[in-house]
Amino acid sequence: MAAGWLNSAHRIARGGNEMAETAVLVTGAAGFIGYHVARELLEAGNVVVGLDSLNDYYDPALKQARLDLLTPYPGFSFVHADLSDRPAIADLFAKHRFPVVIHLAAQAGVRHSLSHPHDYADSNLEGFLNVLEGCRHNGCSHLIYASSSSVYGANTKLPFSVDDPTDHPISLYAATKKANELMAHCYSHLYRLPTTGLRFFTIYGPWYRPDMALYLFARAITEGRPIKLFNHGKMRRDFTFVDDVTRVVTKLMTLVPTAEPGQNGGAPARVYNVGNHSPEELMHVVALLERELGRPAIKEMLPMQPGDVPETFADVEALFRDVGFRPSTPIEDGVRAFVRWFRDYHRV
């Protein structure tokens, strides 16, 4: 488990109204963030229904390995379904009437959206609409959903604030995430569905996605292949450790947005940045990987990739104000935890 790798487990306090009596839905439960959130809830004794399509965007064996770690928990059940399957999603919501839904499933990846745009419409738009409809018709009291720092698009003002304009996405993936925020706000306004959107900033850690930079770099370094450094390595990212993200999500579960005059058009909707508020030079992170893996990287310098940005930097003051916590795991500790898991999983 991630908490074991970092030796910093966080437990969810269970108050008088124990959530074990009703199930929490976690979509994308076999995915990177979804697995960690589901496991944290189960560790605290909650009942969790995990949903995932187990598609082949990346190796399904890794998704199954995560799922295999959740299956032994007595409070866990798994539903194999696609978000775009409207009847299946409607039946699931009608059966369980989830009080809290944590929606982390999506078609991810900026670069993949350049070549497979319809995947994003199916999962991120139609699939999200099915989740919203399920919440609307079945008494959901709080929908927490994943947005992305990519919604800031071509913004040059740093750090990125939740009050900044997000009207100029530079990838289809970012456009679908912005659309999710607008759709959620609409349902909050029309149907008084409380929604909380989380703009994630470069989440990493054990059980990482193999299409992400740190994982790709680690594989290439261990196999003696070049690593591709876009913008000639002149990139800065607000790397955020997954255990910090899990803690944010679980803290926000009981912080249900309310309608406040003069805010968000009176809708019970909130959006937060979830980042480490401390951008790291990409070359520094590569050096940390080299140190932890004990091997030098062969570096291939390339121009900027379409749809990418040179820097991300999260302003998390709104998050800290409302939940009293901000991600803060040092990059050195996080990379060490990731590499420890990577070595163990790949036996290298």
Regions found by a protein language model. Name each.
Residues W5, R11-I203, F325, A337, ...:
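N-terminal Rossmann-like NAD(P)+-binding domain of SDR-like oxidoreductases, especially those catalyzing
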Residues E40, R219-V348:
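C-terminal substrate-binding subdomain of Rossmann-fold SDR/epimerase-dehydratase oxidoreductases
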Residues L158-P159, P210-A218:
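A glycine/serine/threonine-rich, flexible loop-to-helix segment
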Residues A88, D119, E126, P165, ...:
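Residue-level recognition of oxygen-bearing side chains
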Residues A179, M183, Y187, F217, ...:
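Hydrophobic alpha-helix immediately C-terminal to the catalytic Tyr-X-X-X-Lys motif of short-chain
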